[in-house]
């Protein structure tokens, strides 16, 4: 049964999840391989104390919604030393409406993973009716992906205290049907629909990150719901055109009246984001396309701090 554009309800799903564990504690997934999952591969929901280690997920990059690992309303989760290739998000933290009886997604560690995704390699959201907090992502390599690190809030859950460090990100654009336009880092908070107000995003940090891709960093809130307190430290961003797909877009989907926007690409694009710090951070240009523009572009932002920020216009 399809409830609306984004949610499927009832017993029927178009394709089966490979592994679904609900309300299970003290569980270990270790040292196995999954090939060609038809839908989400590993979906723990409402679980506590979960270790996911040394697993390989090799899904068909043309099969949409074949997510890799989807912790949903889970706590005390460690995902380490995994390799994931899939035609959707490799690792996606969720607090889904279907499992809303469980608590927040909190105390999460992701480290030592190699990831390839036609969507986002590591994402928080978009399903987020509950909160997300206390999350660390480190020592990962993301390559050939449509997006690298993504926080997309569309429901009422809040996001706070998320730290990313020591990560290499390579992005390229895929077919426009996929959400994203090759942003290595993206944070957005938009209402899903007329009856759903998006939660608040604050206290996010990025340290020692190297990004090479077809688009720059995007942070977009709204006038009613600004994104707050984001710090970039020792982050290097290089924009370089490599795919056949057009540049000059930002993808705001999904959300109320949100689509792909035609807009020149900046190294850092900030809209309705307050107290953003760019420290020891640079923007460089590789293969330049006509739609590349400024190192930094801001709209309706307050409290932006630049400390040793370098970058010329394209």
Model-derived regions: residue spans:
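Extracellular/periplasmic carbohydrate-active domains that bind, remodel
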Residues: 1-314
């Amino acid at each position: 049964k399809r409830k609306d554009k984004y949610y499927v309800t009832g017993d029927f799903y178009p394709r089966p999840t490979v592994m679904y564990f609900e309300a299970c504690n003290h569980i270990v997934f270790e040292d196995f391989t999954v090939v060609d999952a038809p839908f989400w591969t590993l979906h723990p929901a409402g679980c506590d104390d979960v270790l996911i280690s040394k697993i390989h997920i090799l899904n068909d990059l043309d099969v949409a919604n074949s997510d890799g690992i989807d912790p949903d309303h889970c706590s005390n989760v460690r995902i380490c030393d995994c390799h994931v290739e899939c035609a959707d998000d490799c690792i996606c933290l969720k607090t889904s409406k279907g499992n809303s009886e469980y608590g927040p997604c909190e105390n999460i560690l992701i480290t030592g993973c190699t990831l390839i995704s036609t969507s986002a390699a590591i994402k928080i959201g978009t399903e987020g009716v509950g909160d997300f907090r206390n999350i660390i992502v480190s020592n990962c390599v993301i390559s050939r992906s449509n997006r690298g690190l993504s926080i997309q809030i569309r429901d009422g859950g809040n996001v706070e205290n998320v730290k990313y460090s020591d990560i290499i990100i390579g992005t390229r654009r895929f077919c426009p049907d996929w959400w994203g336009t090759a942003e290595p880092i993206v944070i957005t908070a938009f209402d899903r629909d007329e009856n759903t107000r998006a939660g608040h995003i604050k206290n996010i940090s990025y340290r020692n990150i190297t990004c090479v891709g077809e688009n720059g960093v995007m942070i977009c809130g709204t006038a009613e719901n600004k994104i707050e307190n984001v710090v970039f430290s020792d982050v290097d961003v290089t924009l370089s055109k490599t795919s056949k797909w057009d540049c000059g877009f930002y993808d705001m989907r999904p959300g109320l009246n949100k689509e792909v926007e035609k807009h020149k690409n900046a190294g850092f694009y900030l809209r309705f984001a307050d107290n953003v710090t760019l420290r020891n951070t640079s923007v460089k240009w590789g293969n330049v396309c006509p739609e590349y523009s400024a190192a930094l572009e801001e709209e309706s932002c307050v409290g932006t701090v630049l400390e040793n920020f370098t970058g010329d216009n394209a």
